[in-house]
Structures are given as C-alpha cells and as structure tokens.
Amino acid sequence: SLYMSEFIKNTPGNGKFLYSAFQNYTNTFMKLEQFRAYVIEAATNTDIVEISISTRPDCIKDSYLDVLLDIYNTYHVDINIELGLQTANYHTLDFINRGHGLAEFIDAVLRIKKYPFTICTHVILNLPNDTMRDTIETAKILSALNIDIVKLHSLYIAKNTKLSYQYRNGTISICSKEEYFERVIAFIEHISPDIVIERLFSRVPEEDAYFSNWNTSWWKLQDELLDKMM
C-alpha cells in the first residue's frame, strides 16, 4: 500500500485517479531507498498524473530531489513539493517550536527551483504574536520566491498541548474572526496574481481541538469571507 497517500478522483463519472498525496509527517526524513520505493509505487499507477510530497523546509536534500527527478522523467508524472512555512516571522516560528527559520525555507525553495517541480507553501495567518505586518511580509516573500501554490490555514489548538495551556491561562491570544478575514484579504492583495491559492481555511475533528475556527464551520467562514470581499 502507498505510504501515507490518498487519492482524489477526477471529474464525476470517469473514475480516474489523478493525485497521490504523501501528506502526513516529513516524507523526506525516511530512508532514501524507502522513499524511492513508495513514490515509485504511486508513479506506476497509470491513472495518477501528479504526486505531492509534503515535508519540512529543513529536510530538503538534493539526493531526494534527484530521486524525484528520475521518477518524473521515467514515469511522466508531475511532482509537487509542499513545504510548511507558516509565517515569515522568525520569532513566531521560534515561539511555536518549528525548529527552522525563514532562511531554511528560502534555501529549500532555491534547491527545488532547480528542478521541474511545483512548490506549494502552507501558511497560518492567525498565529500568536503575528500581526497584519507579518501577513503582508509573508505574502511578499512568497511572491518574490515565485512560489506556485499557497494553502492558507486558520490555526487550531490541539487539546493537551503546551499551546492549549497557554491559551487557557491567557498567556497567548488568537485574533478575532473579523481580524482573520482582514488578514486573508490583505494576503490576497499582496500575493502575486500568478500564485494559486488552494485553501483559505483548515479544519480538524472537533473532539481533537481546544480551539478551532472560532467554533464556526469552515464553509460558513468561507461564505462570510466571500461576502466581505464582494
């Protein structure tokens, strides 16, 4: 079976699988030969036309990119690399214990740009301590780096985590829903029009979250945002 992968069907009725996503965890952290085997397993499915690999910016190595290039050329599947940046603010990255800074992200992007792959970046616009200025700066940096795709996330706080304790005792705060809308709009206004925005909100099972989307369903949030943008 494919390692942490899922399939997304094409248009209704044709039954073709198009997309294999290695989404969970840091996929380029596994051993190289194991990584090669899992990706080849996906690539040999003739219905798949794109493989998406999620990983950390500080876990991008040329040897893994070379493996993906070989698979790209051999099996004629597109390759998309998904990197979690979350914010361009180093102090916030340190506060949430990301374990990398902006420099590692830029290095990863420059490495990947040498290959015929697309790059998707994940960004959270309501991290503790981040401001509107950080939102705009993040959008500008992604534009300068010619990122292909962006997925926006609204922060959720998992139960029984350090962040949940800090939120509960008031050490940190999360911006309001209205402020989040303003940040999304500002991000869109400052991001390059050549960059595709694939997601505006994220969601998790309610039973796992101490805080999630201001107790509002993601689709209601999206409708509210679109109404605000009209």
Segments predicted by a language model, with ranges:
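Acidic (Asp/Glu)-rich catalytic clusters
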Residues: I8-P12, Y38-T46, D66-D78, L110-K114
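Alpha-helix-loop-beta-strand connector modules within alpha/beta enzyme cores
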Residues: N45-T46, I71, A103-T121, I172-D194
